[in-house]
Regions:
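Low-complexity intrinsically disordered segments
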Residues: 42-77
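Short, surface-exposed terminal/edge motifs of secreted or surface/virion proteins that either
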Residues: 24-34, 38
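Short, surface-exposed beta-edge/turn micro-motifs
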Residues: 12-16, 22-25
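Surface-exposed ligand/attachment interfaces on beta-rich extracellular proteins
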Residues: 1-10
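Residues in intrinsically disordered, low-complexity segments of regulatory proteins
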Residues: 13-15, 38, 67
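Intrinsic disorder/low-complexity segments
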Residues: 18-19, 31, 43, 49
Length: 77
């Protein structure tokens, strides 16, 4: 399963997904921007949730293939 598949199966509240420098997956309810600390995305005081690695293993989620800064994806409507 790809990250985009998981996002589209999640609650419609979650609009975006991205990974950080360590490969952790996050869902956001609004479009985030890259943090000044250069390790992940910021949620601009909106809500974000980290997807636990155990959940990743359960659903066999493929890691993002590429630079984490290019990992931001939007939910399909």
């Amino acid at each position: 399963m790809k990250i985009k598949d998981l996002l589209n199966l999640s609650d419609p509240f979650w609009k975006y997904a991205a990974t950080d420098k360590n490969g952790e997956i996050y869902f956001y309810n609004a479009k985030p921007r890259i943090c000044n600390n250069s390790w992940g995305f910021a949620d601009k005081n909106d809500i974000a949730i980290r997807i636990d690695n155990k959940f990743n293993e359960l659903f066999d989620i493929e890691p993002f293939d590429g630079d984490w800064k290019d990992s931001l994806i939007e939910r399909e409507e």
